């Protein structure tokens, strides 16, 4: 949960941890429970925006109302919709390659270094606008699609891409986290489909619920922490971390 939303690639850290400690998840549903915890963290922190989108769509479809706030939220909805498409397409086209990447610590190490350099370069971005446009959404969505690879940070690349597009840091971060919701939900549904044949003992369910709780708490804290860092314009700090971890893991996990 702690690394899920920090721009350090939680999937990359998971692969490296499995290599170092020889770990392996016994049940697919563990990932589903963890995803649920992080999903709820985003849902609660950005509940105002999510409620605004739902209300605006309801008014648009059933009441035919066009308030200024409704127009803004409808625009946000379409931006999120467009931003989700690239990840879906790339995920379907390169599913096998992505799955193979999760077996290679070398790929993770290189991608972490790549992510670190990208995050470092965000210090040179300049704010030009306050909101996310449709073209911005598509480009940020492509960045999210690239983050299917372990070692490529989803939050780092989506927020960083937003910064390079001239979007204010807080707005880029807000859009990034909202954009994570359909991805987390989709990943959970796919994992549930894969694990339909698995039987989960009651005591295991209790442990998974505890895992979901920890994922929620640490996910909540990591989002709050990252938002503070972004407001200070210091996203490149995470870049140093990713580069160091990438180089060390590349050397030590040959």
Language-model segment annotations:
Residues 1-254:
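Multi-pass membrane proteins that catalyze or facilitate reactions on polyprenyl-/lipid-phosphate substrates
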């Amino acid at each position: 949960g702690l690394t899920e939303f920090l721009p350090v690639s939680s999937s990359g850290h998971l692969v490296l941890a499995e290599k170092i400690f020889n770990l392996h998840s016994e049940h697919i549903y563990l990932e589903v429970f963890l995803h649920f915890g992080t999903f709820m963290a985003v849902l609660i922190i950005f509940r105002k925006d999510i409620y605004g989108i739902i209300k605006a769509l309801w008014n648009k479809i059933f009441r035919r109302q066009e308030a200024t706030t409704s127009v803004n939220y409808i625009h946000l909805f379409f931006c999120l919709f467009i931003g989700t498409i690239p990840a879906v397409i790339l995920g379907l086209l390169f599913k096998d390659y992505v799955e193979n990447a999760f077996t290679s610590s070398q790929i993770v190490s290189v991608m972490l270094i790549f992510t670190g350099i990208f995050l470092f370069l965000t210090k040179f971005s300049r704010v030009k606008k306050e909101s996310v446009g449709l073209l911005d959404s598509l480009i940020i969505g492509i960045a999210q699609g690239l983050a299917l690879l372990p070692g490529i940070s989803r939050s780092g690349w989506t927020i960083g891409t937003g910064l390079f597009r001239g979007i204010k840091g807080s707005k880029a971060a807000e859009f990034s986290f909202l954009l994570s919701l359909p991805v987390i939900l989709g990943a959970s549904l796919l994992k549930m489909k894969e694990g339909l044949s698995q039987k989960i003992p009651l005591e295991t369910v209790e442990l998974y619920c505890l895992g979901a709780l920890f994922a929620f708490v640490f996910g909540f804290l990591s989002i709050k922490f990252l938002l503070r860092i972004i407001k200070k314009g210091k996203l490149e700090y995470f870049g140093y971390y990713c580069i160091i971890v990438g180089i060390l893991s590349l050397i030590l996990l040959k």
